[in-house]
Amino acid sequence: MTNIRKSHPLMKIINNAFIDLPAPSNISSWWNFGSLLGICLILQILTGLFLAMHYTSDTTTAFSSVTHICRDVNYGWLIRYLHANGASMFFICLFIHVGRGLYYGSYMFLETWNIGVILLFTVMATAFMGYVLPWGQMSFWGATVITNLLSAIPYIGTDLVEWIWGGFSVDKATLTRFFAFHFILPFVITALAAVHLLFLHETGSNNPTGISSDMDKIPFHPYYTIKDILGALFMMLILLILVLFSPDLLGDPDNYTPANPLNTPPHIKPEWYFLFAYAIVRSIPNKLGGVLAVVASILILILMPMLHTSKQRSMMFRPLSQCLFWMLVADLITLTWIGGQPVEHPFIIIGQLASILYFLIILVLMPITSIIENNLLKW
């Protein structure tokens, strides 16, 4: 008699994805972040569901409903801060996951990579709309500034912005629809993640060497289930330290002031995980140029397979490309820092140079360096 986990229609899917899945024997801890993202997503959906039970998406009561959650609901403060800081953990895992894909050439799995880029966009949209919901000063002005960027689109821009707002400014209609979208999008993300996994399992995982590992596979369970649990425990430890000791570390103090359309905060800035994009937007004096640059900064990921000129897939044995990769990481950290600074000298010029360097490394330096490495290895 065959095992039920191999014969039952539903169990069979789970078995083939998480138990008997043939996995490369040499994948490192950088491969943990896919499962960590799954855990983050489940955590966000669960905490978000409980927050939605007590939240009201009306401009007059939204701010006080969040205060009510923190003060009056049993463990409401814990749920709220797990959700807020869970988003930060989500983005840390996302950035590392994408970085791993760039470093080890995982973008050569075209379908998996492209679905991943769509997922990145969707998660960013969801996080942005979630930041608007507490209806503090930074929520309101962040929503106003970021949605206003769409008015740079020629001809339809202004109409598009007013259509998104549901009026002539960010108001009740905007808050209600953002809540609706913020609630539904995580389920869209879950569906996309399932497709992402489906395409990945068509090809099998990449590994640090970038060489086919078909002749050396091991079952996912118990080897990688235990490894993923260890990663999850580490992540939960960091998250709990953040939530229980300094829950407001990554937030903005301005968001503890109720939204006031008549009073603009001195420095409008988004959450830390959008600061790199915000720095790119601000580094171009032209509004449309800034919008195009920031969209390009993420859409550029789709071009990665076309920009791959090396004969090797992974950067593991390519020291020159490794230097460029870490330059890119340092550049993104610089952009994140600049995004949180006021628009004044010397931050403006640093932001402009960092933005130019970002595109230069990806579009010019990396492909050229790969060709040089090919020639050095006489390939």
From Swiss-Prot:
The keyword Heme applies. Its cofactor is heme b. SUPFAM superfamilies: a domain/subunit of cytochrome bc1 complex (Ubiquinol-cytochrome c reductase), Transmembrane di-heme cytochromes. CDD domains: cytochrome_b_C, Cytochrome_b_N. It comes from the Eukaryota. GO terms for molecular function: metal ion binding; ubiquinol-cytochrome-c reductase activity. A ubiquinone binds at residue 201. InterPro entries: Cyt_b/b6_C, Cyt_b/b6_C_sf, Cyt_b/b6_N, Cytb/b6-like_sf, Cytochrome_b, Cytochrome_b_C_euk/bac, Cytochrome_b_N_euk/bac, Di-haem_cyt_TM. This is Cytochrome b. It comes from Sus barbatus.
